[in-house]
Swiss-Prot record:
The gene is Tmem53. Keywords: Developmental protein, Membrane, Nucleus, Transmembrane, Transmembrane helix. This is Transmembrane protein 53. GO terms for biological process: negative regulation of BMP signaling pathway; negative regulation of ossification; negative regulation of osteoblast differentiation; regulation of nucleocytoplasmic transport. Its main location: nucleus. Disruption phenotype: Knockout mice do not display severe skeletal abnormity at birth, but exhibit late-onset short stature. They show craniofacial dysmorphias, including hypertelorism, thickening of the calvaria and minor sclerosis of the skull base. Platyspondyly is also observed, as well as short limbs and underconstriction of the diaphyses. Pfam families: DUF829 (PF05705). It is a single-pass membrane protein.
Amino acid sequence: MASAELDYSIEIPDQPCWSQKNRQGGKEAGKQQPVVILLGWGGCRDKNLAKYSAIYHKRGCIVIRYTAPWHMVFFSESLGIPSLRVIAQKLLELLFDYEIEREPLLFHVFSNAGVMLYRYVLELLQTHQRFRHLHVVGTIFDSGPGDSNLIGALRALATILERRPAVLRLLLLAAFALVVILFHFLLAPFTALFHTHFYDRLQDSGSCWPELYLYSRADKVVSARDVERMVEARLAHQVMVRGVDFVSSAHVSHLRDYPTYYTSLCVDFMHNCVQC
């Protein structure tokens, strides 16, 4: 079972509160219990994700929370090592372990760390026979995705490492900067032969369900322009997309600064996606 090998949290409400209506007669045909998978930002703790989880759990959704290890996000991905693909497969296998694979599925993805993992989820949904029939209804992106932004990535990594000894912190930051400069700038043409950057992969994704992008021009980690370019690219692929600029909130701080508005955006999006 994937659940024995993955450090995740799951919340299952006692009763589903979603009715699935028969479109012709208007009679209740059964119960839907949407599943929401939260993919956390780099260095995110489960207690941080739990605040977002509550938005959905209170409304009768099953919620799975997971944050990829920071060393995989910052180093494995930068080196072109697809170790997150294994995690993505285990996450999707959880749906079968809990026998919820037939329920509507929504992703809520945070920052580039969440997007890097989500990228492999998308690939598995399109290529893996077992996952091709999962019913994904929508994706929310919070504070991402961002294109190659070394300064922003260093800021994010510095935040994760702030409790580490100063010497170790400086060594890891220097090592990360060197890897990015080498593989994403100097050797970019060679790297592209065996590893496509997650931002480029997401731009050209074949997924067709609605997407909601929540970002801010005050974000110092992920550029608002990167998010807006992604919105434009997805619209060009005829995907139903909406972008919301919170203007003044910092990276992954939109819920904290605008709790009512943020919650209403997420809940309304979920309702619309599940009922389509």
